[in-house]
């Protein structure tokens, strides 16, 4: 038999610990990050590269070949390549004073109106104002025959004649004296008619 000592038992005290051979055991749920090595002759980019700087939305990035439009003092945009002609320009909304053609102003005795005829020429027509119909004939234009006339008047018994007749009866005037107001034209109503076409125009009442 040989005198060599027996080989050490794998589980004996002289066996190296598992931690000494393979290091610390990995922690469950955690994996070591994979580090990619660059190929020979190339270097990794710096790690502090971030997103491009932020610019406010009101100032867009100009593109190559783009010419910004011209902005006037009042805030209006003008297309590129357009320039106003030189010379003084009045501000917007300003109208220089100057002589203007006379308009259709009303003259004495009536008011005027401008009427366009089919030929396109402007014609001034004078329209008479409303006349005051009273106890005397009036010069006017007949609304029926459209002629300049002087009205024809006639007298008719009206309300004022009856009121004066009842007043005479109340004061004791009998024996037909109450009919005296009906015989006076100054107390009667006045009717205006056209002497040409005999059409009725207006009735002037002494007492409404």
From Swiss-Prot:
The entry's Zn(2+)-binding residues are: 142, 145, 194, 197
* Record-level GO cellular component terms: cytoplasmic side of late endosome membrane; cytoplasmic side of lysosomal membrane; nucleus
Provide the primary localization.
membrane
Which intervals of the chain form a coiled coil? none
Q: Which residues lie in Pro residues bias regions? A: 1-13, 36-65
Q: Keywords in UniProt for this one?
A: Apoptosis, Endosome, Lysosome, Membrane, Metal-binding, Zinc
Which BP terms from GO are recorded? intrinsic apoptotic signaling pathway in response to DNA damage by p53 class mediator
Q: LITAF domain spans which residues?
A: 122-206
The protein's GO terms of the molecular function aspect are: zinc ion binding
What family is this protein classified in?
Belongs to the CDIP1/LITAF family.
Present the record's domain note.
The LITAF domain is stabilized by a bound zinc ion. The LITAF domain contains an amphipathic helix that mediates interaction with lipid membranes.
What is the role of the protein in this entry?
Acts as an important p53/TP53-apoptotic effector. Regulates TNF-alpha-mediated apoptosis in a p53/TP53-dependent manner.
What's the protein called, per UniProt?
Cell death-inducing p53-target protein 1
Q: Which organism is it from?
A: Bos taurus
Name of the gene encoding the protein in the UniProt record = CDIP1
